[in-house]
Structures are given as structure tokens and as C-alpha cells.
Regions:
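Class I SAM-dependent methyltransferase Rossmann-like catalytic core
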Residues: 1-15
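Class I SAM-dependent methyltransferase SAM/SAH-binding core
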Residues: 32-34, 40-89
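Conserved catalytic/acceptor-binding region of the Class I
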Residues: 130-196, 210-211
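Conserved alpha-helix/loop element of class I SAM-dependent methyltransferases that forms part
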Residues: 12-29, 46-50
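A short acidic, Gly/Pro-enriched loop at the edge of an enzyme's catalytic core
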Residues: 88-99
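A short SAM/SAH-binding and catalytic strip from SAM-dependent methyltransferases
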Residues: 99-112
Length: 250
């Protein structure tokens, strides 16, 4: 499983939203910007940031628990200041960053409210906290209907891995509890509404196979993949997972 390709795919889902939120949050005038859970660098890499060539004065910081992910991130964002650390215990002084953001992170941290408290703590007064994308798998819809069984199994697997699968629908309330003034929130997309390319579909199946390893037989996976491929070619393949964003100010 090539996780950097997966993260790039996720980054593609939010590209327009990120450009909008960074603009509203004043990225062009920022001095220091932090990504919490930077992973392999799909977001923090210069190519993904708005008009990066015009704002070279902005210092980019990233933090992640995974040493392997950070090693990959250094290849894609060589100019960023990267640190290995925990989102629940950010190793930065109070009021350090103009913008602090995360992307598909809070569902994995175990205590998302504490993570938001930490993001708020390290953000300057009047600075901005952005949660770019948090899914709600409890409202997932799979089409054709025969695929719903596999969707449920994947959701169960995510729970077993420690994911908070319904966090998206609670995102605004978490910002409120953390004392972050909410400026805008909403559903950014229903994943699957646009037709997938074959490469994107194969990437989705790589994730499915990784999530379901040891819980579904190879024969079952092969049968479901064949069924799904037929649906894709008929234009009937669809996975809808409401995904939420929140933008707040300290």
C-alpha cells in the first residue's frame, strides 16, 4: 500500500476548500503555519499551498508521530521544519503560529478535544485553527447495494483500528467545547459523487484490502472487487461518506 499516493488522493478532494480557507485565514500574511499530522507531506509540500511562490516568507512547520512518514515528508517538503511528536502534546510554545491546521487527523488521535485544545494553545490570539476534513462513516452509503456489506466491514475495521468513525458530524461541537470561535463549518463533499478513474478506483481498493486484511477471505474480496469493477464500468459505482470541515479563530 502506497500511503503517500493515498494522501495525495485525499489532498485532491480538498484542494479547492484548502485554497479558500487559507485565503480567508490570511495565509499570505502569516509568518508561521503548522500542520498537525503532516504525514508524508501531501498537504505541506509547496505544490499544494496557495500561491506558495508568492509567499516564501511563510515558515512551514509539520509534526507527526510516524518516523517513516516524516522521512517521506522531508523528500516532498524539504524546506519545512519537521518534528516527530504527538498531537495531544504539541512541543511548541504558546501563541507560536498564525495558522494551525489538520487534515483527516482528528478521527485517529484518541482524544480529539485535547488535540484541538493543543492546536488552540499554540496558535496566536486572533490566529486561525482549521480542521480541513473529518469524515462521518456512520452516514456512509455504498452503491450498488450489494457493496454495503463491504462498507460496513470496513467501518468496523476502522473502529477496531481506533478510529472515531462519526467524528465529522461532531466537529463543530468539538470546536465549541475547545473554546475556538467557529467562523464556518459544513460538509465539503460526498465522496464518490464524481466518477472515479480506474487508477483512483484501484487506490480505493488498496485501502479496502489494507483495512480488511485478516477479516475477509481472499475469495470474498475477489468476488466483491469483481462486482464493484462491473459497477464502475456501468457508471453505477458510488461511495458517499459525508466529510466535514471547520474553521475557527482563537
Amino acid at each position: 500500500m502506497n500511503w503517500h499516493n493515498r494522501y495525495l488522493q485525499q489532498a485532491g478532494w480538498t484542494r479547492e476548500l484548502r485554497a479558500y480557507l487559507f485565503r480567508k485565514a490570511g495565509f499570505s500574511g502569516a509568518q508561521r503555519v503548522l500542520e498537525v499530522g503532516c504525514g508524508t507531506g501531501a498537504i505541506i509540500c509547496e505544490e499544494s499551498l496557495p500561491d506558495r511562490d508568492l509567499h516564501t516568507h511563510v515558515a512551514l512547520y509539520g509534526i507527526d508521530l510516524s518516523a517513516a512518514s516524516l522521512a517521506e515528508c522531508r523528500k516532498h517538503a524539504p524546506g519545512a521544519f519537521l518534528t516527530r511528536g504527538d498531537a495531544l502534546y504539541l512541543p511548541y510554545l504558546d501563541k507560536t503560529f498564525d495558522i494551525t491546521y489538520c487534515h483527516f487527523l482528528l478521527l485517529w488521535v484518541g482524544d480529539p478535544l485535547r488535540a484541538l485544545y493543543e492546536m488552540k494553545r499554540v496558535t496566536k490570539p486572533q490566529g486561525h485553527v482549521l480542521a480541513m476534513a473529518e469524515p462521518d462513516y456512520t452516514s456512509r452509503v455504498d452503491r450498488p447495494p450489494e457493496m454495503s456489506w463491504l462498507g460496513k466491514r470496513q467501518t468496523e475495521s476502522l473502529i477496531e483500528q481506533g478510529a472515531d468513525v462519526g467524528i465529522g458530524s461532531r466537529l463543530a461541537d468539538l470546536f465549541y467545547q475547545a473554546g475556538i470561535s467557529l467562523l464556518e463549518t459544513g460538509v465539503i463533499q460526498n465522496r464518490g459523487k464524481d466518477a472515479l478513474t480506474l487508477e483512483e478506483w484501484e487506490n480505493e481498493w488498496s485501502v479496502l484490502q489494507a483495512d480488511l486484511a485478516g477479516t475477509v477471505t481472499r475469495e470474498e474480496l475477489h468476488e466483491m472487487k469483481h462486482l464493484d469493477e462491473q459497477a464502475l464500468r456501468r457508471g453505477e459505482h458510488e461511495i458517499i461518506i459525508p466529510t466535514y470541515f471547520a474553521w475557527g479563530q482563537v
